[in-house]
Regions:
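Short capping segments at the starts of secondary-structure elements
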Residues: 21-29
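Short, charged/polar, Gly/Pro-enriched secondary-structure boundary elements
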Residues: 68-73
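A short, conserved structural fragment
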Residues: 49-59
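Minor-groove-contacting beta-hairpin "wing" of winged helix-turn-helix DNA-binding domains
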Residues: 59-66
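Short amphipathic alpha-helical interaction segments
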Residues: 36-49
């Protein structure tokens, strides 16, 4: 299931992950924070990277400018 809906809104899991990524985290840290299975986090993070909302550097995931804007819109 895509994490970004056709209307541009985010699925609830994607919303939760980008809220966690206000500071950089590894996939494992995201799992611990949200109590989700690693496979679900990895697949959602992969889609967020493809959507240019999240970037990965040395195993750490963080928000891009567009991702940070999504967090502001949700707040």
């Amino acid at each position: 299931m895509p994490c970004v809906k056709p209307d541009g809104t985010l699925e609830p899991m994607a919303q939760a992950i980008i809220r966690v990524l206000r500071t950089p985290h590894t996939a494992e840290e995201i799992c611990e924070s949200l109590r989700l299975p690693l496979y679900r986090v990895r697949s959602t993070v992969r889609e967020l990277v493809e959507a240019s909302l999240v970037a990965e550097t040395n195993g750490q995931f963080s928000l891009t400018g567009a991702g940070a804007e999504r967090v502001r819109q949700q707040s």
